[in-house]
Amino acid sequence: MAPPITDDDLDGLKQPYVTFSSGSASPPRSTAEAMDFEEQILEAIKSDAFLVDWIGEDDKGNPQNLPYWRKWVITMSLALYALSTTFSSSVFGAATHVLAEEFALPAETVVLGCTSLFMVGFATGPIFWGPFSEAFGRTRPLLAGYLGFAVLQLPIADARSLTSICILRFLGGFFGAAPSSILSGILADIWSPRERGFAMPTVGAFLTIGPILGPLIGSVLVQSVLGWRWIANVVAIASFLIALSTFPFLPETYTPLLLARRAERMRHMTRNWAYRSKSEEAQSSIGDFAERYLLRPARMLALEPILLMMTLYVSVSFGLLYNFFLAYPTSFIQERGWDQTTASLPLISILVGAIIAGALLSFSTNSRWAPNAKEGRPQETRLLLMMVGAVSLPAGMFLFAWTSSATMNPWPQILSGIPTGFGIHLINMQGMNYIIDSYKIYANSAIAANTFLRSLFAAGFPILATSMYAAIGVKWGTTILALLAVAMIPIPILFYYFGAKIRAKSKWQPPL
């Protein structure tokens, strides 16, 4: 049997060939001894002695230790990406009737091409951008996707057919999905779970504000001398300005990639090729990515009651938001006789409601309305605020529907947007947070399923609304949708009382 190896023997790994010091065990003479000695060397190499990780909690290379101001610069940059891409998702809705006249097509066809196809691209984008962010880090796919989104706005302004617009809008949604697919990962990279309670609602508010601002600004552009083509130019200019002002301050934050880079530097500095990171030990294949972003999300959505019902509820509320981008113009233009720009102003009330909800979420982060295992508050605690939103949403919708008559004062209908926006934002944010809490290490797969279905609902509701409001009007059309929102109210109540038991039986329940 070969003598045991010493530290001096391991030092030899720093050279191109293994060497032995004069005070170490002599090289093995027999084949058996040589094989035994090599096995010991390999075991030493495989040990954690050469595994590269963060050096203590204060390691400056760890994104969690970035300066506080730098974290907020990154967070607000992500918020601006979310704002501009979601703004683009709804802004062309203001040009629906103008485009229908210019291309001599039905309004439903224009809605399909300008809004719905963008959201279909937004739904399919995460299937690509999620794996891309794990293989190449956060910044590369974020920059590639956002710049692609900005560039694709330019040819829309010169498009001569609705077919061209449809293709460009779909691709714009696909590339524009990159920030939304990656931002939650970046926030998790730089903020602790407690700090994330403030950062996530901030970014989430911009995700809701963006599509609300779209019809407001779009209406102004359509009615101005600039015309509908400048909608795309404005989105492009704003996106390029955001990119130029934020990209220089956006570092790589993906821990596996940062540690792999550190391991590579150490290998070249020491000539010791045994240094490696955990991510280099477990290289992901195409099959792994397919499992994580296609197969597992589909299985979880089909087999997990919490994910299925919460995703359905969040998707309906998100679809209702896009429905209102058609309901408001239909009611205030066609029924009350307002001009397009003035008719878009009542949407501000939905924005106000969303901002109030965002402020409430930030305030409640460290209150009894937030989960806290040490104080005996389970994950289901956050569903209390979701219940508030569940009641607020249909209340606002009923008020909007039953005060829509042209003979009634418009202010009750205008102010109905406050409880509507308040409810939509609470349902979306608390539903997403509950999904993340429930599946933790499988949250990426759960969110991938949620994002896909949510975007499809946002694509489908405007098409439904166009036909429905034309057939039965705003009052009864919105009443039917409000009843759908009422039917969803039991979902957070059910999981508040039985969610813990359901999670305990889950195949994807993470270990404690």
UniProtKB/Swiss-Prot annotation:
Q: Which UniProt keywords apply?
A: Cell membrane, Membrane, Transmembrane, Transmembrane helix, Transport, Virulence
What induces it, per record? Answer: Expression is positively regulated by the cercosporin cluster-specific transcription factor CTB8. Expression is also affected by nitrogen and carbon sources and pH, and is also controlled by another transcription activator, CRG1, previously shown to regulate cercosporin production and resistance.
**What phenotype is described for loss of this gene?**
Reduces cercosporin toxin accumulation and fungal virulence.
InterPro entries in alphabetical order: MFS, MFS_dom, MFS_trans_sf
Which Pfam families does the record associate with it? MFS_1 (PF07690)
| GO CC, any one term | plasma membrane
PROSITE patterns documented for this protein: MFS (PS50850)
Its main subcellular localisation, reduced to a broad class, is membrane
Q: According to its UniProt record, where is this protein located?
A: Cell membrane
Stretches assigned to coiled coil: none
One GO MF term: transmembrane transporter activity
- CDD domains given for it? MFS_Tpo1_MDR_like
Q: How does it sit in the membrane?
A: Multi-pass membrane protein
Function comment: MFS transporter; part of the gene cluster that mediates the biosynthesis of cercosporin, a light-activated, non-host-selective toxin. The perylenequinone chromophore of cercosporin absorbs light energy to attain an electronically-activated triplet state and produces active oxygen species such as the hydroxyl radical, superoxide, hydrogen peroxide or singlet oxygen upon reaction with oxygen molecules. These reactive oxygen species cause damage to various cellular components including lipids, proteins and nucleic acids.
Q: Which family is this sequence assigned to? A: Belongs to the major facilitator superfamily. CAR1 family.
Q: What name is this protein filed under?
A: Cercosporin MFS transporter CTB4
Q: What is the source species?
A: Cercospora nicotianae (Barn spot disease fungus)
